[in-house]
């Protein structure tokens, strides 16, 4: 039971004297024992003990970036795919392009997402989230991009 207590105290930074150290030889007098117990003991600094532990800092990871793009032509779809290849999710706003161009962009992005094993999700009428395989898309969206109801230009 005392070993568990010693481990907890050592982890917190307080060290207890081992019982073996308390046992003194018969040759020493009691006065010497009292003087030794009053002397400060060297305790290993907490900072040096932490370097021995294998603890990973949670905040050491780099920041996660989400790219927001508003393509103006079909040629801008390549830039969206380049971000996907570098494992960055992209929010694509297709509100400024014609419906035929928007359809081509979504088709191109759908093929790219399939090839890269990612996902694509519709957020609103003209806004889509395109994510690589290392990003999960979660939330209450209006619908997946399956069917003619999602694409009004497919009437």
From Swiss-Prot:
Organism: Acetivibrio thermocellus (strain ATCC 27405 / DSM 1237 / JCM 9322 / NBRC 103400 / NCIMB 10682 / NRRL B-4536 / VPI 7372)
The keyword Cytoplasm belongs to this UniProt entry's keyword annotation: yes
Residue segments, region Disordered: 16-44
Family: Belongs to the SepF family.
Function: Cell division protein that is part of the divisome complex and is recruited early to the Z-ring. Probably stimulates Z-ring formation, perhaps through the cross-linking of FtsZ protofilaments. Its function overlaps with FtsA.
Subunit structure: Homodimer. Interacts with FtsZ.
Pfam family, one: SepF
Acidic residues compositional bias, start-end: 16-35
Cell compartment(s), UniProt: Cytoplasm
Protein name: Cell division protein SepF
Chief site of localization: cytoplasm
Gene, per the UniProt record: sepF
């Amino acid at each position: 039971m005392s070993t568990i207590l010693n481990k907890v105290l050592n982890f917190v930074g307080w060290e207890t004297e081992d019982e073996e150290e308390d046992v003194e030889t018969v040759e020493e007098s009691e006065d010497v024992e009292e003087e030794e117990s009053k002397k400060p003991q060297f305790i290993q600094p907490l900072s040096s003990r932490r370097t021995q532990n294998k603890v990973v800092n949670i905040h050491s990871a780099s920041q996660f970036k989400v790219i927001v793009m508003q393509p103006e032509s079909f040629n801008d779809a390549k830039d969206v795919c380049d971000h996907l290849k570098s494992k960055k999710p992209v929010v694509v706003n297709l509100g400024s392009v014609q419906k035929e161009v928007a359809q081509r962009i979504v088709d191109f992005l759908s093929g790219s997402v399939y090839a890269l094993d990612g996902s694509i999700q519709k957020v609103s009428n003209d806004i889509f989230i395109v994510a690589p395989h290392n990003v999960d898309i979660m939330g209450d969206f209006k619908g997946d991009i399956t069917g003619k109801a999602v694409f009004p230009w497919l009437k």
